[in-house]
Each structure stands twice: as C-alpha cells, then as structure tokens.
Design a protein with these regions (language model features):
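First transmembrane helix
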Residues: 1-28, 147-160
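Individual alpha-helical transmembrane segments in multi-pass integral membrane proteins
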Residues: 2-16, 32-46, 50-92, 97-114
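Alpha-helical transmembrane segments of multi-pass integral membrane proteins
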Residues: 27-49, 101-103, 131-195, 203-210
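Juxtamembrane "helix-exit" motif on the non-cytosolic side of transmembrane helices
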Residues: 50-60, 114-127, 163, 187-198
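Non-cytosolic membrane-interface motifs at loop->transmembrane helix junctions
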Residues: 59-71, 127-134, 198-209
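Membrane-anchoring/interfacial helices and their immediately flanking loops
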Residues: 93-147
Length: 221
C-alpha cells in the first residue's frame, strides 16, 4: 500500500506539472484565465512534490486534520475559484479583490498564529470523527470551522455569477465547474472523516481527475 501511495503522489505531481506547463504555453493573448489556472495547478505540483520527498525520506505525513493542512486546503480551494471568476468576469480580478476573497482565510491564519502565541496546543487527531467527542475545546472547533469553510468558495462563484459584473458567462459551464470542485471537496472530506490509506489514494486520483477535467473542459478559454 505504501508503494502504491508513493506512486500515486508521484503521478499526481507529474500530471499536474505537465498540465501547468501546457496551460502556460497555450495561453492566449489578453487572456489571463489560462495563466491563473496554470499558477493554481502549480501550487498542487508543489504540494505533491514536497509530500513525495517527505515520504521517500521516511517522514510521517502530517495528520490531515491538523490546523496547518486545513488552512492549506482552504487556500487551495480559494485559488481554484479565481479561474472561473476570471472567465465569468474578465478583468474583474485585481490584487485588492483577491485580497478581499482571501480575507476570511487571512483572518483564520491570524487567529491560528495568535492561538499558538497564547499557548494553545493542537491535539493530534487522525480524523474529524475522532475530534467530535472533544468539540468543546477551541482547538477542535476551530479545525471543524476550517473544515466547513472549505465549501464556502463554491458559494462565492455563484454570487459573482449572479451579479452584473460578468460579460462572458456560461451558465452550464459554471455549474459543471462548481460540481467538479464540489466532488473534489467531498473526496477530501472523506479523507478528513476517515483518514484511511485507501481514501487518501482515492482522493489523489479524484483530485487529479478533477483538475484535468477543469483544464480540458473549457479549452476555448
């Protein structure tokens, strides 16, 4: 199982790397959406490579319900909504608006750092289910909140789409994109809830598959 896990992580890194390079090479003039998606996928490449190196060195992977990994997951999901926003409303994204989209994530990071300074100890749990019995403590409900917030970006996409800010809308594509992202998030939630090796391997395949579907599903963007 360990070798299969290693091979899966390596394959994920390779596929995402090739996809990121292809997106950047095929970028269109005056079109930022492909560049944005290429940058987002490159973050996945970095995550896969660092995990692969750690596993090869015999390091124990950090628990999926650690506050740091949950913050990282929220960062990645927020990154993936930048692409459809740019497609829906070309040119709407600016540095200030990206900061606004990431505002609740930045607030969560600040709360996490302050909690560490105040001496809060984050008990290692293997899964969300294992934490529920201790939900009365701050370090547990904070991580539960981070788990719920993973689904928030999908609502942001629909909010942007329903405003009059967009000029290049495709209702069917937006629904497919949000559905694909939701499948990815649900697969990740299974890992958070049960934390079995089989679910981790399944999640990597689902994640890479969803990324490829996103990249080829809107080839004209």
């Amino acid at each position: 199982m360990q070798y299969l896990y290693l091979a899966t992580v390596f394959a994920g890194a390779l596929v995402c790397l090739l996809a990121s390079i292809l997106l950047f090479v095929r970028r269109k003039e005056a079109k930022r959406s492909r560049v944005i998606l290429a940058v987002i996928v490159s973050f996945s490449v970095f995550n896969y490579i660092t995990r692969f190196i750690a596993l090869c060195n015999g390091e124990t992977p950090e628990l999926v319900v650690s506050a740091k990994l949950l913050l990282q997951a929220n960062f990645m999901v927020l990154g993936y909504i930048l692409y459809p926003i740019e497609v829906i409303a070309p040119g709407w994204l600016s540095f200030q608006r990206i900061l606004k989209l990431y505002s609740y994530w930045l607030l969560a990071v600040v709360v996490y750092l302050i909690s560490l300074q105040l001496g809060v100890e984050y008990t290692p749990y293997g899964s969300l289910l294992g934490m529920l019995a201790h939900s009365g403590s701050f370090e547990v409900w904070f991580r539960l909140l981070l788990s719920v917030l993973i689904f928030a970006p999908a609502l942001i996409v629909f909010f942007i789409h329903q405003t009059r800010l967009y000029r290049n809308s495709d209702h069917i594509w937006v629904r497919k994109y949000v559905l694909t992202l939701s499948v990815n998030m649900l697969a990740y939630m299974l890992v958070l809830m049960f934390n079995h090796p089989e679910f981790k391997i399944l999640y990597y395949y689902v994640s890479v598959g969803c990324s490829l579907y996103i990249e080829i599903g809107r080839a004209h963007v």
